[in-house]
Swiss-Prot record:
Domain of life: Bacteria
Broad class of the protein's primary localization: membrane
PANTHER family documented for this protein: CARBOHYDRATE TRANSPORT ATP-BINDING PROTEIN MG119-RELATED, GALACTOSE_METHYL GALACTOSIDE IMPORT ATP-BINDING PROTEIN MGLA
ABC transporter domain location: 6-241, 252-497
Species annotation: Treponema denticola (strain ATCC 35405 / DSM 14222 / CIP 103919 / JCM 8153 / KCTC 15104)
UniProt keyword list: ATP-binding, Cell inner membrane, Cell membrane, Membrane, Nucleotide-binding, Repeat, Sugar transport, Translocase, Transport
Protein name per UniProt: Galactose/methyl galactoside import ATP-binding protein MglA
Membrane topology label: Peripheral membrane protein
């Protein structure tokens, strides 16, 4: 009997004249983890949509356990043992864990939903997977990591032979990542196979047996992880060699510019006694564990969270923002962590998203000028090197990296003095990351004061001048980037736990 679970042969897919998949071949073996990498727009999502029946393939064949398949929709795929855990989890947050597990297939007894059987089945399932989850818990009260466990357990309950994990660690702490990996390894021993889609190379090398790399719709590399290295994978992804993971941080910070003194926020989660200074043209990293208060601090600086006491000043001029509109008027910009929820209008165009925060600048005699709007959009497309068809294209059609470029371009149109960036490269491929790093350093050289939140320690060490570390919503310390290391950052992040 063959140990091949999934085999994709010569898979091709076009949209009009644009060929997004070109003769893809991929083999996933039983009990193995196949890493799938590639720049945003390389074809990973299209490939998965062809597998799950969302798109109809133009050419090629897909087989599951040596049986030819062509799913009509994801539900049919799930019932056949092929499941996907999305980056943005697909759950009913106001229902219990048990309800989510059995949604659409409730066990009944004489036509009545058998809640006792559901609870017992759910408890047994979590026990078999060594997951500490209470089936009666409402999903909304659970952490992202716990919700993810529920999604994986749901896949297992369908007797899944293959589980696709899409950027599974993007919102997880280091401890939660280790828990996820232990679950993956336990399921591997039971014969379950995985496709692990990620931009995080260190994770691919840790948890995957094989790795495949897509570029421009073609399979560039597919081999055992043990037989490759980081440089080969990067070269396969971007089509060129990246000698360094990070550009040179060669900006020269100037005099003190932004000063925070004894800052305390009013509503939970409360930040307490936050004091620090950022210089003009400086890149200050903000590091801490999930829940440390990093995002909340940026929100307080941007007028989203109410400040109970303390002060914010620029060039010794005290400021008090009652809204984000006031913060923007004083030269602040905020790149949010959840770009799809808070950073863009997903149903609108690149052009609309570029100009929406600065409409008064595109008026002629009080009337919006289509010419000025188009010029602004095209200017930012060129500046950010955004890969798109035109400014009229819907932003939702772009890859994650290109969406982020549009959002950054939107703020650059306002020429901010202080740029607050919350996880600016989250869910973005290595090539696009490098471009955003270059942009951050370029902005600092132009005199902008930048605060960057990142959960990736190599990133926070690779693109900053200094690093402020948060612990339990308090400032644990500030260190010079060139004089610190990962151990110091971890020790500071646990200071007030």
């Amino acid at each position: 009997m063959s140990d091949v679970v999934l085999e994709i042969k010569n898979l091709s897919k076009s949209f009009g004249k644009n060929k997004v998949l070109d003769g893809i071949n991929l083999t996933v073996r039983q009990g193995s983890v196949m890493g799938l990498m590639g720049e945003n727009g390389a074809g990973k999502s299209t490939m998965m949509k062809c597998l799950f029946g969302i798109y109809t393939r133009d050419e090629g064949a897909i087989s599951l356990l040596n049986k030819s398949i062509e799913f009509k929709n994801p539900k049919e795929a799930l019932e056949s043992g092929v499941a996907m855990v999305h980056q943005e989890l697909n759950l009913c947050l106001d229902r219990t864990v048990t309800d989510n597990l059995f949604l659409g297939r409730y066990p009944t007894n004489f036509g009545i939903v058998d809640e006792i059987k559901m609870f017992e089945s759910a408890s047994s399932l979590f026990s078999s997977l060594n997951m500490n989850v209470n089936p009666k818990t409402i999903m909304r009260t659970m952490s992202v990591s716990q919700r993810q466990m529920v999604e994986i357990a749901k896949a297992v309950s369908y007797n899944a032979k293959l589980i696709v994990l899409d950027e599974p660690t993007s919102s997880l702490t280091e401890r939660e990542v280790k828990k996820l990996f232990s679950i993956i390894r336990a399921l591997q021993k039971k014969g379950v196979s995985f496709i692990y889609i990620s931009h995080k190379m260190d994770e691919v090398f840790e948890v995957c047996d094989e790795v495949a790399v897509l570029r421009d719709g073609k399979m560039i590399l597919s081999k055992p992880v043990a037989g490759t290295n980081m440089n080969e994978i990067i070269s396969a992804m971007v089509g060129r060699s990246l000698d360094k993971r990070f550009p040179d941080v060669d900006n020269v910070p100037g005099e003190d510019f932004l000063k925070i003194e004894n800052l305390k926020t009013k509503y939970a989660p409360v930040l307490e006694d936050i004091s620090f200074t950022v210089r003009k043209g400086e890149i200050l990293g903000l590091y801490g564990l999930v829940g440390a208060g990093r995002s909340e601090l940026l929100e307080a600086l941007f007028g989203i969270r109410t400040i109970e006491s303390g002060s914010i000043s620029i060039n010794d001029k005290y400021l008090k923002f009652k809204s984000s509109k006031e913060a923007m008027a004083h030269g602040f910009a905020l790149l949010t962590e959840e770009r799809k929820l808070n950073g863009m209008f997903g149903k609108d165009t690149i052009e609309f998203n570029t100009v929406i925060t600065n409409l008064n600048n595109y008026k002629t005699i009080g009337v919006l000028s289509k010419r000025k709007i188009r010029e602004a959009a095209n200017r930012e497309i060129e500046t950010m090197r955004t890969r798109c068809l035109s400014a009229d294209q819907g932003i939702s059609a772009l890859s994650g990296g290109n969406q982020q470029k549009v959002i950054i371009g939107k703020w650059l149109e306002r020429s901010p003095d202080v740029f607050l960036m919350d996880e600016p490269t989250r869910g973005i491929d290595v090539g696009a990351k490098y471009e955003i790093y270059q942009l951050i350093i370029k902005m600092a050289k132009e005199g902008k004061t930048i605060i960057v939140v990142s959960s990736e320690m190599p990133e926070i060490l690779g693109i900053t001048n200094r690093i402020a570390v948060m612990s339990n919503r308090r400032l644990a310390g500030i260190v010079n980037t060139k004089e610190t290391d990962q151990e110091t950052l971890l020790r500071l992040s646990a200071k007030y736990l």
